UniProtKB/Swiss-Prot annotation:
Keyword Nucleus: no
PROSITE patterns listed in its UniProt record: AA_TRANSFER_CLASS_2
GO-annotated biological processes: L-histidine biosynthetic process
Protein name: Histidinol-phosphate aminotransferase
Subunit record text: Homodimer.
Species per Swiss-Prot/TrEMBL record: Geobacter sp. (strain M21)
Broad EC category: transferase
UniProt keywords, alphabetically: Amino-acid biosynthesis, Aminotransferase, Histidine biosynthesis, Pyridoxal phosphate, Transferase
Metabolic or biological pathway: Amino-acid biosynthesis; L-histidine biosynthesis; L-histidine from 5-phospho-alpha-D-ribose 1-diphosphate: step 7/9
Family membership noted in the UniProt record: Belongs to the class-II pyridoxal-phosphate-dependent aminotransferase family. Histidinol-phosphate aminotransferase subfamily.
Cofactor list: pyridoxal 5'-phosphate
GO molecular function list: histidinol-phosphate transaminase activity; pyridoxal phosphate binding
Residues spanning the signal sequence: none
Length: 350
């Protein structure tokens, strides 16, 4: 009998979006990847590093990547930690701040992986719901949990919380407020200024969406130096390999390419939203690189299966709050045109 911890033996685990091995056979709109390739400068940097540096250990402090991030975000590098995907930072924040039996919280629906990470640590999980107008409900006036995770823009729904609301929430918490800005580059506002204003605010970012680097597993966090120092104590000392560090620095340095990719995705998002609304879909206004859309008959399962049969992958959730709709990533204009055609073929249902 393997001597597993009881909580590990009993937990369900997180289920990521389907990743087909024959990806070229599909229009893949289920995991919010970028339809455009990384900057050519990223590919050049990776090739150079692969040819010269792989026999050496990577820089344990990811100095060059942090320096580029500092230029882009306007913080001293001591306020920044690089990560093997933003999930690494989320995990280490729980490890650093929430002990066994202590509580973390997040909004449901949002990124359910927060709960999985907390379960691994033996922390308790508390969730708060949303009203029909997407207002969080039930959060105490003064919440004393160790961590509160706020996905902004929200995923999978795509709406945003105002910076005034986030600042008010930060002031009501005795623990750390983690603003997960995985999709913020497709939105209009960021909480970075709140990191300076509040000592309990952390902002996390990923390179998987707007920088087209989901396959590299790159992320970062920005917080007060004392919290960054604590996270550095518990991360893997070589958490980013040499290729990832080179890719991160090059991606951050090529802001014109990054901004053009974001512009095209936002433009396609607006077009796709308008097309869906023409034949009766309810679409939540989105600030991410995806939309959450419900067909006229509210049968998300029917549409999901119909698209799957046509080799178009989207994300369907079994949670009763979400099962009526689909989260559809924004691909290239050509991919979205084919998706609109398929949705028209599937019709409004009953």
């Amino acid at each position: 009998m393997i001597a597993l911890r009881e909580n590990i033996a009993e937990m369900a685990g997180y289920v990521p979006g389907f990743q087909p091995l024959d990806v070229a056979s599909y229009i893949k709109l289920n995991t919010n990847e970028n339809p455009y390739p990384p900057s050519p400068k990223v590919l050049e940097a990776i090739a150079k590093e692969a040819g010269e540096g792989l026999r050496r250990y990577p820089d344990a402090a990811s100095v060059l990547a942090r320096e580029e991030a500092a230029k882009v975000y306007g913080f001293d590098p001591s306020w920044i930690i690089m990560a093997n995907g933003s999930d690494e930072v989320l995990n280490n924040l729980i490890r650093a701040c929430a002990g066994e039996g202590e509580e973390i919280a997040f909004i449901n629906p949002s990124y359910s992986y927060y709960g999985t990470l907390a379960e691994v640590q033996g922390a308790r999980v508390r969730t708060f719901g949303l009203t029909e107008s997407f207002e969080p409900e039930g959060i105490p006036e003064h919440y004393d949990g160790k961590l509160f995770f706020l996905t902004n823009p929200n995923a999978p729904l795509g709406f945003t919380y105002s910076q005034r609301y986030i600042a008010d929430l930060a002031g009501r918490l005795s623990g750390v407020l983690v603003v997960d800005e995985a999709y913020v580059d497709f939105a209009e506002e960021t909480s970075l200024d709140l990191v300076r204003s509040f000592d309990n605010v952390v902002v996390t970012r990923t390179f998987s969406k707007s920088y087209s680097l989901a396959g590299m597993r790159l992320g970062l966090a920005i917080a007060r130096p004392e919290l960054i120092a604590a996270l550095n104590k518990i991360r893997d000392h070589y958490n980013l390999d040499r290729l990832a560090q080179a890719a991160a620095a090059a991606a951050l340095a090529d802001q014109p390419y990054f901004k053009e990719c974001v512009r095209k995705i936002k433009e396609t998002r607006a077009w796709f939203t308008a097309e869906l609304q023409k034949f009766g879909y309810q679409v939540i206004p989105s600030s991410g690189n995806f939309v959450f859309a419900s067909p006229p008959d509210r049968d998300g399962t029917r549409i999901y299966q119909g698209l799957y049969d046509r080799k178009i992958l989207v994300r369907h959730f079994t949670d009763p709050k979400l099962a009526h709709g689909l989260r559809i990533s924004i691909g290239s204009r050509e991919e979205m045109e084919q998706t609109v055609k398929a949705l028209r073929e599937l019709g409004p249902g009953r």
